[in-house]
Structure formats: C-alpha cells, structure tokens
Amino acid sequence: MDRAKLTGVVLRAVDYGESDRVVTLLTAERGKVSAFARGARASRRRFGGALEPFTLLSAEVRERSGSDLLGLDSVSVVRGFGALRGDLGRIACAGYAAELARELVRDHQPHDELFELLVAYLDALDAGPPRPAALRAFELGALRAAGLMPRLDACARCGAPVGEGPVRFDAGEGGALCAGCAPGVPRTLPLAAGTLAALLRLQDGGLAAAASEPLAPPAGREAREALTAFLEHHLGRRLAARRFLDEIGPLLGA
C-alpha cells in the first residue's frame, strides 16, 4: 500500500515531540494501525479535533519508508459522538471499550466484527447513559472477535451440561464449571442461574439483547467480576481504563 483511504475509530492519541501526534486506529479495512500526524499539535487547521479518542473518521494515509507508522495526511470526521463526551460515565465506558479493542487485536489484521461492534457501542453511549448489560455485551463480542469466548453453555473443563442452578466460573479453565468439576478448582467465582442465563442471552444477542436486559445487582456484579477475571487472565493485567471504571463503577454498575 502506497496511499490509501481508511475508515477508523481513534483508539488512542499520544503527543510526540513538540508538535506531532501518534494515533492508533481500529479501521474497517486493515484492523489496528498506528499513524504519525505531523504538526497535529501545532496547528488545528489541518486535523482539527478529529484525532481525539473515540472519533470515527475517514483518513488518507501513506506508508513511510523505514517506519511501521503510517503517515497521516488528512482526515475528516464521520461521527464525533459529541453527546457521550459531556458525561464522565460515558467517557469512562468509551475509554474502556477503546483500550480493550486495542489490546485484543494485533496490528494490521482486519477485524470487521470488532470494528462494527465498537462503532455500535459508541452509538449506544452517544444515545443514552451507559448500561451495564451493554458493556458486558461489548466485552463478550470483543472476546468473540478475538477468538477468546468463554464457555458458558456447558462445563469448560469436561463439556457436561452445567444445569439450571448456580454454577462456578474460572477464567483459567475457560468459563463455567459443572458441580462435578468446580470443587477441584480453587478460587472460583459464583454465577447464579439468573446471571448465567443473562450472560448467555448477551453472548447470543449482542448489543441488541442488552437493550432489554436489566442485569441488576447482584447479577450485574457477578457478570462484571467473571468477565473482568477472564479478560485479565488473557491480557495478563487489568486495563488502566478498567481501573478507572472500578473507581466510578458503583455509580454506573459498570
């Protein structure tokens, strides 16, 4: 690729030197890419506010000799998601979704499913307050796109049905555990029958199912703890945006 036009969501923007900026995009065409925006901080005339996180933009890029970074020549805003930027809770959820998307995928590997999911989740945040069920649906969808979906429909260890009662969940084992396997696994997390059923509905129905899924406490807490543990197991750490959500989460249920 010498020059190309990409459509992408800004996942991160980092200042570089006195006047430049490096942006990471999740694009529809090429997956995750990073681009060098020369002079982006010195003059707003060229890029305006288009390089802010969560912005959906159209970008003209070019390859740069001897560098893994693309050159960012021009951009235009497709969606600014202005409504979500006026609310701390929505900003926190958008930041978490962007960081999770950035960490789950490798560079230059197309991820149409994750790109579309991220745009849809930002649309939902732009339209109204954050919903715990929507964030869980985003996490599950992002894990599916990355090939890391937890096993919830049967025991992750032996494959047996888990039944209709409460179960245990273990990230290292890969998901829910039946009554026969759970006692042999230390430090498992509880999942009530209603919590497991809600997660299965969100796993199958995605963001559309989240609109009719209340996921109220204690189910919301159990679902959050299980998916947070699963993500930490695969990523090797707790995301910075997740830690921020933990600070303000009691106000959001996120």
Swiss-Prot record:
<keyword id="KW-0227">DNA damage</keyword>
<dbReference type="InterPro" id="IPR042242">
    <property type="entry name" value="RecO_C"/>
</dbReference>
<dbReference type="GO" id="GO:0006302">
    <property type="term" value="P:double-strand break repair"/>
</dbReference>
<dbReference type="InterPro" id="IPR003717">
    <property type="entry name" value="RecO"/>
</dbReference>
<dbReference type="GO" id="GO:0043590">
    <property type="term" value="C:bacterial nucleoid"/>
</dbReference>
<protein>
    <recommendedName>
        <fullName>DNA repair protein RecO</fullName>
    </recommendedName>
</protein>
<comment type="function">
    <text>Involved in DNA repair and RecF pathway recombination.</text>
</comment>
<comment type="similarity">
    <text>Belongs to the RecO family.</text>
</comment>
<dbReference type="InterPro" id="IPR037278">
    <property type="entry name" value="ARFGAP/RecO"/>
</dbReference>
<dbReference type="InterPro" id="IPR022572">
    <property type="entry name" value="DNA_rep/recomb_RecO_N"/>
</dbReference>
<dbReference type="InterPro" id="IPR012340">
    <property type="entry name" value="NA-bd_OB-fold"/>
</dbReference>
<dbReference type="Pfam" id="PF02565">
    <property type="entry name" value="RecO_C"/>
</dbReference>
<keyword id="KW-0233">DNA recombination</keyword>
<dbReference type="Pfam" id="PF11967">
    <property type="entry name" value="RecO_N"/>
</dbReference>
<dbReference type="GO" id="GO:0006310">
    <property type="term" value="P:DNA recombination"/>
</dbReference>
<keyword id="KW-0234">DNA repair</keyword>
